[in-house]
């Protein structure tokens, strides 16, 4: 018995490595998952992704306040090693920063120039046309629908 509908067979490529060989993996309740035999990623069928509106509303529930001391301590685990490697004359992009970026605020406090991009909260795509000395994607990658496309965008 095939547990995957004909609609599910429309999954044509792996969202991570872009292989054209995704295979049905498992169905859990109504959610259908796929696997890639090349990179071994497991991914949810696009048919089950949240709508853009629901995704936006979900992100509004995140409590990553740039002034919250506990969250700043958490973010400093990324910031501190970067501060050791970067010159203050460098410019960075905080990609997928959300509505309030503690990381960007902390970089600015240390004298860095940071540009914000987020498809929901800072959607000005023209900032993606510039070159940056560094790019951060803190707590972001797991939200990418098509990671390969996002990383290619950042690499161009």
PLM-predicted stretches and their roles:
Residues 144-154:
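A short, conserved alpha-helix within the catalytic core of class I
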Residues 1-134, 138, 149-151:
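Conserved N-terminal segment of class I S-adenosyl-L-methionine
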Residues 139, 143:
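A short His-aromatic
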């Amino acid at each position: 018995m095939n547990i995957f509908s004909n609609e599910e067979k429309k999954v044509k490529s792996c969202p991570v490595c872009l292989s054209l060989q995704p295979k049905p993996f498992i169905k859990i309740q109504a959610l259908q998952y796929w696997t890639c035999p090349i990179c071994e990623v497991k991914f949810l069928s696009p048919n089950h992704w949240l709508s853009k509106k629901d995704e936006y509303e979900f992100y509004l529930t995140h409590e990553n306040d740039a002034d919250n001391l506990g969250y700043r301590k958490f973010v400093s685990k990324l910031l501190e090693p970067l501060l050791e490697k970067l010159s203050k004359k460098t410019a960075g992009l905080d990609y997928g920063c959300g509505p309030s970026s503690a990381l960007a605020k902390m970089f600015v406090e240390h004298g860095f120039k940071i540009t914000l991009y987020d498809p929901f909260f800072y959607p000005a795509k023209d900032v993606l046309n510039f070159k940056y000395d560094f790019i951060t994607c803190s707590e972001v990658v797991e939200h990418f629908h098509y990671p390969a496309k996002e990383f290619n965008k950042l690499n161009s």
